[in-house]
């Protein structure tokens, strides 16, 4: 199974693609979609959407794994990340990908073994 994992944001969207078979992961590709702080917010969301859509088209994942929204004290950041998650989820839904959401702590523990 090919999995696209995404760390959502509106400044930087980190992504990685792995193939999973027989309890083993094999890296396929990884990168980031970066947006410029000097660009209007709606344009940044468009860039996130286009970048994620391109990754989906190029790598052909079967599922999307994404971090759930983590509440922070900075409401402006939370709202921005929520909007970015929305366009990421839209790109995945339009591609017909099943979406699996995980809390940030669970992602950290799975990747590092602790957290």
Predicted features by range, described:
Residues 1-115:
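Phosphate- and other anionic-substrate recognition elements at nucleic-acid/protein interfaces
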């Amino acid at each position: 199974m090919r999995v696209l994992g995404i760390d959502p944001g509106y400044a930087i969207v980190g992504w990685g693609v792995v193939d999973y078979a027989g309890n083993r992961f094999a890296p396929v590709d990884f990168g980031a979609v970066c947006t410029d702080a000097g660009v209007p917010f709606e344009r940044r969301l468009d860039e996130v959407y286009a970048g994620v859509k391109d990754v989906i088209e190029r790598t052909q994942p079967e599922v999307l794994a994404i971090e759930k929204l983590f509440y922070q004290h900075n409401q402006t950041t939370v709202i921005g990340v929520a909007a970015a998650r929305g366009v990421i989820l839209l790109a995945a839904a339009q591609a017909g990908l099943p979406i699996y959401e995980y809390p940030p702590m669970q992602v950290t523990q799975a990747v590092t073994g602790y957290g």
